[in-house]
Amino acid sequence: RWTVKTSAYTAVAGDRLLADTATTAAFTITLPSAPAVGDEIHILDSAANFDSANLTVARNGKKIQGLTADLTLTTENTGIGLVFMSDTYGWRVLVDAYAVDTTEL
């Protein structure tokens, strides 16, 4: 089941989020602080607005793609999945059929 989010939110394992930055402008989705291996979070740009109102995915102390930086989604219609692998690698990004600006990874 997918849930619409229009403001800051802390995700939980299994979330499927329709992020609408057109309603209230750019905001942040924070990943869980104590994920288990295999936990997944899915995020879609429900309003095709990430290019003008970015969505930040805050790492909450864990890495994303092995990096110690938050992820900023800046391409409209972007959809990603994140799977937690380990403390070493952190969250791995699964990209859907839409483009993702990988310069932000």
Report the location of each language-model feature.
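Exposed extracellular interaction/assembly regions and N-terminal maturation sites
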Residues: 1-58, 89, 94-96
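Surface-exposed loop/edge segments in extracytoplasmic proteins
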Residues: 64-66
